[in-house]
């Protein structure tokens, strides 16, 4: 497998597409591309068809997906404020593109357009439009019906309203639904960094009703939180005031869950009179949860730890990666440009990297697929997998 990335920031959409495709093609050193990922910044929304046409004139891969996004990633750079086109090419990688649509019916709704293979343990890349496809249903389907199926991707961030989204699939530009790629044989390794760290202790949920949690270990959640805060430093108390999150343990068989074992959800509200809290997830009695905090320093540490752990466990050589990082990260979170991209390149030795800023990140935690926020989710492609 060989992977190449090309990028061009010239304002002319067609010229940028031609130059980016040419750069990526040259990096394949004569090998034929088997998969292309085409990404454009929001400035090129109205010329998405021209971008795709220009790329296909330069290369004609058997599989192509992509989108127009709020900001895009190329190499060690995150291009947030200028027009750009990025082309990511891979050779020697089996790939099959597909699209999905969400159709409402008199009795409910249907997901149409593609059937996941129940017998295969394949990796799927998914790029859903947030306005026409409920991403939570998209993620829950493989969890419930297809255990072992891993999905990675990002909710497309390029549109400000319904109809603004631009998705690429092979020779077509779409404005709704989901585009995706099936990668047989798990040639990609999912890597997910949620940017949080736990505080206090894990508690068993002893009282819950939907998204409302009334008891943690037999006491109101706010009482548990006050007990934790009393033992924190002033700086940590400030984080609780501005960046408090809830972590739900995914694998209840873990004796001592730690960083990376939780799916992180937001705190929606609290009732001081009862001590209960509401979170952005339905929670069952018996689940284990722990309060979490998120800040730039913690997110940097978590990303480094997650990538280093993944690199140490790779079953082969890292050939390249696709990154789906939250549009709330970047300069907004870290105060500097290029944080996630440059950190990944530093830790993985400058591998070919591309991606985009997403409005929700998709990736597995402890073997269960989830939709995240403020997260960096990555598909790390591995050559010579055992």
UniProtKB/Swiss-Prot annotation:
Segments crossing the lipid bilayer: 54-74, 347-367
Membrane topology summary: Multi-pass membrane protein
Main location: membrane
InterPro entries for the chain: FIST_C (IPR019494), FIST_domain_N (IPR013702), UCP018953 (IPR016741)
One annotated Gene Ontology cellular component of this protein: plasma membrane
Subcellular localization: Cell membrane
Short name of any one Pfam family annotated for the protein: FIST
UniProt xrefs under SMART domains: FIST, FIST_C
Superkingdom classification of source: Bacteria
Entry keywords, A to Z: Cell membrane, Membrane, Transmembrane, Transmembrane helix
Family of this protein: To M.tuberculosis Rv0628c.
Record-given protein name: Uncharacterized protein Mb0898c
